[in-house]
From Swiss-Prot:
CDD domains: TGS_ThrRS (cd01667), ThrRS_anticodon (cd00860), ThrRS_core (cd00771)
Keyword check for Flavoprotein: no
Molecular function GO labels: ATP binding; metal ion binding; threonine-tRNA ligase activity; tRNA binding
Domain TGS: 7-70
Spans through the membrane: none
Oligomeric and partner information: Homodimer.
Entry keyword annotation includes Nucleotidyltransferase: no
Listed name of the protein: Threonine--tRNA ligase
Cited InterPro entries: aa-tRNA-synt_IIb, aa-tRNA-synth_II, aa-tRNA-synth_II/BPL/LPL, Anticodon-bd, Anticodon-bd_dom_sf, Beta-grasp_dom_sf, TGS, TGS-like
Family affiliation: Belongs to the class-II aminoacyl-tRNA synthetase family.
Length: 659
């Protein structure tokens, strides 16, 4: 007689560190976390199965590699899931407090989340506090967040009839028109169209701060409906929020717009126009020094300078594809009639690239001439939305340290490596030691978004990967983040407050040589296509300097400081000697100011400290008699006495070494 024995099937899961574990088939991400430890189960937010993110409740039914995602997961994956769910919780809170509100897009961003909303109510700071409290109330209700797969046509009916949300209906009928089914997330009476993943339960949210309200447009299109964008950030503990708010306070002190005004670096004026910064003398010195630094380094590395106009014929940008591809972010064409009555249109230059391609094609090139490395600090113009403008960091007129390298295919990987090396050199020289690299590749499922064939893209991406691997840089892959003409290597720096900024870039381009019919004569006597590398270590001078101001809190290294030394005589009797010292510094290339006002030395020192001047030379009768100086360093105080020769040697060496 035999017995039926119920043996539950098991599967093997493999963790990132290589460990294996046998679990019952159908176990959820939460079950797996619980089997590892109660602490991990409490902190678990989602699961990655065979490289794909999924909700924590997703069942594992086959052997798989798995990774439990927590808030502090490397690469900010956990934070983005948490903040994306927080945007849904905020939307639910708004819907409960302000019935009839409609919802556009609500993604996670670098530091938190936002939601674009359509409402007749104009939201204010008092409303934000009410919404915060409602979000915490939703958290206390411990509402399960549930995913539902729904046929697209049924989803259209759901959002049209039940939710009465025209924005979700538009997405379903437009962006998702090819989808057979879509995912919807429910939390209580609230529901949203979303691919997820999301938190398992609203109770994970323990602390929230809504930070800002700004204007926006549906789908970023200024011709569409205006919306209100509410920003916020949330955390799984009150302690983390407190730490974040402390960092925000420090960020306010470092705000480049605040410091830019206090240190007299740049100004913004509505008389000139939004997003068009004006460089004041001290800021112009910083920019000039940075440009000179890169120009000299480029000269050593074989670059040649070029200059191009600020406007160009619209046909040039149609040829390159920048128009109409970037037309939404460009200023309207300038239209006029020539002497024969023919209408011509010009654009404020949105990119430097097409102009450089014309320079290349202006003469016959041989394979022996390549690589040709052109470089220009070229000003370009983009019509950014007013709500997106942010001092120097997001402007409408800005200068790019643009270079285009024209090379043979057999030279390409070497040239990419050299461009990577230059970019890393620039960042480390300027104190950005924490650098991330992202390889931005195209989305093969959306080939129509890009120029060139799939075959060309495969080759370009192969070359970029080979160069990155040869340079031994750690990188992450960003699918769908490439430029329309080629893959790119983006450099993301982390500043003193831990914030990430995308600055430099290196891009490979097989498309523009075709569009501009660029060629060189090969060793076989026949024409061949060059490959182009677009390269900009700073990216935008304005953005880079804005980030640098906040990174250093305005305490620039000596070689960049607008005023490097303040010469501060104590009494009128030593003015003659102070003038001699001042002139000696000027003669040796040091930017020095002489303060001969009849103020007490304490006040002069305080003002120099506030002005963040790196060195203060104090001169009294004792110093004048011995022909020495007393030296103070910003934030470090008294450095003792020095001879004039020792002072000169020290300053010149520090400037030369860019230390």
């Amino acid at each position: 007689m035999s017995e039926n024995i119920d043996v539950q099937a098991t599967v093997t899961v493999t963790f990132p560190d290589g460990r294996n574990m046998s679990i019952p088939s159908g176990s959820s991400g939460y079950d797996i976390a619980q089997s590892i430890g109660h602490s991990l189960a409490r902190e678990a937010l989602a699961i990655r199965i065979n490289g794909e993110l999924a909700d924590l409740g997703t069942a594992v039914t086959d052997d798989a590699t798995v990774e439990i995602i927590t808030f502090d997961h490397p690469g900010a994956t956990g934070k983005h899931i948490f903040w994306h769910s927080a945007s849904h919780i905020m939307a639910q809170a708004i819907e409960e407090l302000f019935p009839g509100t409609k919802f556009g897009a609500g993604p996670a961003v670098e530091q938190g989340f936002y939601y674009d909303i359509a409402s007749e109510h104009r939201f204010n700071e008092e409303d934000l506090q009410k919404i915060e409290q409602q979000m915490l109330d939703i958290s206390k209700r411990s509402i399960d967040i549930r995913r539902e797969e729904m046929p697209r046509e049924k989803a259209i009916a759901f959002f049209s009839e039940s939710r009465k949300d025209p924005y979700k209906v538009e997405i379903l009928q437009d962006t998702l028109k090819e989808a057979d089914s879509v995912s919807i997330y429910h939390q209580g009476a609230f529901a949203d169209l979303c691919s997820g993943p999301h938190l398992p339960n609203t109770s994970k949210l323990k602390a929230v701060k809504l930070t800002n309200i700004s204007a926006s447009f549906w789908r970023g299109d200024s011709s569409r409906e205006s919306m209100q964008r509410i920003y916020g950030i949330a955390f799984p503990s009150a302690k983390l929020l407190k730490q974040h708010l402390a960092r925000l306070e420090e960020a306010k002190k470092r705000d480049h717009r605040k410091l830019g005004a206090e240190l007299e670096l740049f100004m913004l004026s509505q008389d000139v126009g939004s997003g068009l910064p004006i460089w004041l003398p001290k800021g112009a010195i910083i920019r000039s020094e940075l440009e000179a630094f890169l120009k000299e380094e480029q000269r050593k590395r074989g670059y040649v300078p070029v200059y191009t106009p600020h406007i160009g014929n619209i046909d040039l940008y149609k040829r390159s594809g920048h128009y109409p591809y970037y037309s939404d972010s460009q200023f309207p064409p300038l239209t006029y009639k020539d002497d024969l009555g023919r209408e011509e249109q010009y654009l404020l230059k949105p990119m430097n690239c097409p102009h450089h391609h014309l320079i290349y094609s202006s003469q016959l090139r041989s394979y022996r001439d390549l690589p040709i490395r052109m470089a220009e600090f070229g000003t370009v113009y983009r019509h950014e939305q007013s709500g997106e403008l942010n001092g120097l960091i997001r402007a409408r007129g800005f200068t790019q340290d643009d270079s285009h390298i024209y090379c043979r295919p057999d030279q390409l990987v070497d040239e990419i490596c050299a461009a990577i090396d230059l970019t890393k050199f620039v960042f480390t020289t300027l104190g950005f030691d924490d650098i991330e690299v992202r390889l931005s590749l195209h989305d093969p499922e959306n080939q129509g978004k890009y120029g060139g064939t799939e075959e060309v893209w495969k080759q370009a991406e192969k070359d970029v990967r080979e160069a990155a691997d040869r340079m031994e840089i750690n990188y992450v892959i960003g699918i769908g983040e490439a430029s329309f003409y080629g893959p790119k290597i983006d450099f993301i720096v982390r500043d003193a407050l831990g914030r990430k900024w995308q600055l430099g870039t290196v891009q490979v381009d097989y498309v523009m040589p075709e569009r501009f019919d660029l060629s060189y004569i090969g060793s076989d006597g026949k024409p061949h296509r060059p490959v182009i590398i677009h390269r900009a270590p700073f990216g935008s001078m304005e953005r880079f300097i804005g980030v640098l101001i906040e990174h250093t809190a305005g305490n620039f290294p000596l070689w960049l400081a607008p005023v490097q030394v303040a010469v501060l005589p104590i009494t009128e009797e030593v003015h003659a000697y102070a003038e001699r010292v001042h002139q000696m510094l000027i003669d040796n290339g040091i930017r020095a100011d002489l303060d001969i006002r009849s103020e007490k030395i304490g006040k002069k020192i305080r003002e120099a400290e506030v002005g963040k001047i790196p060195y203060m030379v104090i001169i009294g009768q004792k110093e004048a008699d011995s022909e020495e100086i007393s030296l103070r360093r910003h934030r470090k105080g008294d450095q003792g006495s020095l001879t004039l020769q020792a002072l000169k040697d020290m300053l010149v060496k520090e400037v030369r070494n860019k230390s």
